[in-house]
Structure formats: C-alpha cells, structure tokens
Amino acid sequence: QINDSNILILGLTFKENCPDIRNTKVVDLVKALEQYNVNITIYDPYVDPQEAKKFFGLNCLNLPPNNLSDELFSCIVGAVKHDAFRGLDIDSMLKSNGVIYDIKGSLVHYDKRL
C-alpha cells in the first residue's frame, strides 16, 4: 500500500555530483507520487534548499545522512547517483518491510530492491 507512506527520495539534481536542478526529472517523480497522498522527504547534499523551493515548490534537505535516521521510511528511492549516497546506512532508515527502488543502481541492498 502506497497511500500515507513515508518515502525518502535520494537526489534532486539533473545529474550526479553537481548542484544543477534545471531540467531534473526527479520533480516529475515527486509530482506523480504526491497523487497517492504520501509523505515525501527529499535529501540532496548538493541542492540549495531555497532554490528547490523557489523553482519547484519542493522542500529539500541538505542535512548530513546521520540526521535522517530518526524517521523510518516505507520506501527509499535512489533517484540520483551522488557519491555522497554510497556510505548511507539505508537499513537504519528503512522500515523492516520497506522497499528500495534504485533507479540509478547506486544503492547496494539487493535483498530489499523491487
């Protein structure tokens, strides 16, 4: 069930390891998921949160990964292949029955991938 789920999206930029959010397709993903009444958290260490808000009306966190582990997510989406995501402790952020949708193949958790 996707309704009312907490979803973490890793990455918002147009391409990996750069701050450019112009022409990003991640916004399309966010808009599609919002139709299901989900709670979306976007984390991208390269994005200026004010720019994400200004251009797309999205809240984007640029907090260090360890600050995200207080909340458990039903789904984690690897949307951009930033080097900064390699060391993330995905298991500590994911519910026990949660899933990982790894669009870019950057998250190494084969047992929970869709």
Spans of features found by a protein language model:
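Structural/interface elements that position substrates and couple domains in central-metabolism enzymes
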Residues: 1-114
